[in-house]
A protein has these predicted regions:
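Alpha-helical cap/lid subdomain in secreted, periplasmic
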Residues: 8, 18, 51-66, 79-226
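Serine-esterase "nucleophile elbow" of acetyl-processing enzymes
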Residues: 2-73, 85-92
Length: 226
């Protein structure tokens, strides 16, 4: 099974591990939002951020950790970029993760048609990552968009195959860890062949899917501490 990949992580100093609070910020769309209370940015919702935070705290009891979830349901890459200063840079996180992109594809076919090209997705994502690098010292974890098998989403699956290489290349350039969720789910479905086990619609994870993402998120987090 393919493992979560560390990219070009530089180690945290001993001081940052032991003498200060480490702020971890989750960013993305509905998969990250997961029903969080938007009046309280410490509310992690009921999706993978909640389970990932629990695993990270369990695995790293020596760290003083603060978790923030600012995912917003329905967001495309352009919308995430537009709000990224108040919902990202302003918090000056030590670790920031991003899971975005599936809505850019979905809106090509949904009732509110928005034609976002692959080139626009790449540019929006690049601008977000450049902003993180220029205006924070945060470690970056990128999680790829994914789509589990669903008969009504064949066009989306075809489009995703051209978006995934874009995200992968941006991760190589900017990220400290990359989580190839689409590949990881594909591998998992070889032994658990029912996509409904992880998601009722191929996109939004149920509890099993959220825990699956969280497990690989926690591995990525551990890799950037080395």
């Amino acid at each position: 099974m393919r493992q979560t990949l560390a990219v070009h992580s530089a180690p945290f100093t001993a001081k940052s591990l032991t003498d200060m609070k480490m702020r971890v910020l989750f960013q993305g769309d509905s998969i990250t939002d997961a029903g969080r209370d938007k009046r309280n940015y410490h509310d992690l919702g009921h999706g993978y951020p909640f389970y990932a935070a629990g695993l990270i705290q369990e695995n790293h009891p020596d760290l003083d950790l603060e978790f923030i979830n600012l995912g917003i349901s329905g967001n495309r890459t352009s919308q995430l970029f537009d709000r990224f200063y108040p919902d990202g840079i302003a918090f000056q996180p030590d670790v920031i993760s991003i899971l975005i992109g599936i809505n850019d594809i979905w809106h090509r076919y949904g009732p509110d048609l928005v034609e976002t090209t692959d080139e626009q997705i790449a540019l929006n994502y690049r601008k977000i990552l450049e902003r993180i690098k220029a205006q924070t010292n945060a470690k970056i974890i990128i999680l790829s968009p994914y789509l589990l098998d669903a008969d009504d989403k064949e066009n989306m699956r075809r489009d995703l195959t051209t978006v995934l290489p874009i995200v992968r290349e941006l991760a190589k350039e900017f990220a400290d860890a990359y989580v190839p969720l689409d590949e990881l789910f594909d591998e998992a479905l070889k032994t658990q062949p029912q996509p409904m086990y992880y998601s009722p619609d191929g996109v939004h994870p149920n509890e099993n899917g959220a825990k699956f993402i969280a497990e690989h998120y926690a591995k990525a987090f551990a890799s950037i501490l080395k």
